[in-house]
Amino acid sequence: MTRRVLVIEDSQDIADLIALHLNDEDCDVTVVGVGVDGLHKALAGGYDLIILDLMLPGMEGLELCRRLRAESNFTPILMVTAKSAEVDRVLGLETGADDYLTKPFSIHELLARVKAIFRRRESWSQTGEANEVITAGDIVIERAQRSVSVSGRAVDLTAREFDLLV
């Protein structure tokens, strides 16, 4: 299964290295070098993972992460940055990152962390949470069937609309 990864990294050499190895792992990689552009791409959705540098032109990675989470975008985020102090790692994770890797890094470690994130996400989607029924007033969302009804009448949604809803 091809997974979509958004790499938001201003160093073209690092971005190219990450993209090259992720492509070898059957990932479809989009690379963006400016924070604001990365935010727009991420909010457009459809990514299975975001690899995010912290020190970016246009918008810092922490602010980008904050905005994504404020918009209820819970795409897993792996922060990859030169900021290696404990306070930076803790801040990154508390801001909403799922993992944190400091530069310089081993490409093998990065790939192992990416695979671990994919495994966690896959196991989550196979749990009962993925099959739950969500009810809010007269709205019923059935995740397993990917269906929505309002007052008992089915609502036709595109896959993207359904993903945004849940």
Regions found by a protein language model. Name each.
Residues 2, 46-48, 72-76:
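His-Asp phosphorelay/catalytic-motif detector in bacterial-type signaling
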Residues 8-9, 32, 50, 101:
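Conserved sequence signature across two-component system core domains
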Residues 26-35, 41:
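Short hydrophobic/Thr-rich beta-strand motif most characteristic of the beta2 strand and flanking loop
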Residues 46-51, 56:
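Active-site beta3 strand of CheY-like receiver
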